[in-house]
Amino acid sequence: KYGSDNQADRSRIRFSKYDLKSDSFSTAITISDTTGDCLDSDNTLEGATSAVGKNGEIYAVWAGYESIWIDKSSDGGVTWGKDQIIAFQPGGWDMDMPHIMRANGMPFIASDTVKDIQYVTWADEFNGNADVWLIYSKDQGNTWSERINVSKDTADGHQYFPNLTIDQKSGEVFIAFYD
């Protein structure tokens, strides 16, 4: 229940997939192993995005508890593994910016289906101001690189609202964000 401070009301990450043959979505299943509050806070699980890997595995990432989480399904979304924290998100996903009500640093995932590399970008206040970060996995999400500062600003500016895509022919990674 959105906005509820009742401990019985919890946020979860759910998954459903579209079937072309039946022209319908599957019944949604909960894929997050933990739950968050419903206050639209850093303790709320939200901002889920997904990507399909080289071998058909499905990856889902989301934010919550000042962390970036991932889960993976290797059977088309029927079953999911154990949630894994792949990065800490100091300050959480909801960042206060000058002249903006709130800036989000939600994670986005994309898969290079040729090289079998998964990339995740997000924004946080790791350096004291909002920056955009990238990590990647070359082993189907089992281990992740160190965080890379994409925005590389030299002033006290803020970068946020990131998103990414991959050129599946060249393998180039493109990240767009507000600055």
Labelled PLM ranges:
Residues 1-179:
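Extracellular, repeat-based ectodomains that mediate carbohydrate processing or recognition
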